[in-house]
């Protein structure tokens, strides 16, 4: 009996220390974001909280779709909620049943939340649990990863925030046009009285979140890009973590318990960071190799090449 009490006490102290460390890490991240982003941090926090609340509300739906996942699709729930509410807002505006305003965006979100609550109550009566019960630590670390990646890319974007180069000015112009418009498609900024005759889905969702959060395109233009980049880190982490966890089922003891999270981090780094390695290879590595071989260090580098076909690059003169 005394041994059980002693073990319970030790376990309680360990959990207490873990929670304190997690709290300190959360405070450090929030404080660090305030220091790095200065006045822009309020918009950053707003989008992060908005994604979190929407994702939480969508868990009755996401939890069923990802029922085999330990986290029940926690990170994916954020994107799913934005996609569903954004699409239905666009649909209602496109068929002229509603105006593209903040009020409409909020109304659609509230209807979505009510539907999710009703679904949650229905699932509860049937004994279906859609929340990641017993995996609080995993959810905490996924939120840390998402927040840290979002913060990192937002901070980097601040060094070159101008809407300059390739299609950036067009993207910014489309967003401003949709912010002013109450109909969709919005009036094209290039053609007087004409409508945007170009795919504008990405810009639309950026404006949807901008109107929903009552902010301005001047702040959210870059924020949307970094928001997507954060998902590009957190989603691969969640997916590969679960894949490795399932593959090693029954073997996750001792040091092997670190394998799934390390595999998840490797996936996030591979997509979010290594996926942007085109610049390093073609701008620095290949010219350096050419120089070592006695040739001219001429890379002919143009950064949009990363979005084009990579076939037959070995035949490039």
Predicted regions and their residues:
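Polar low-complexity intrinsically disordered regions
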Residues: 1-17, 126, 248-258, 310-317
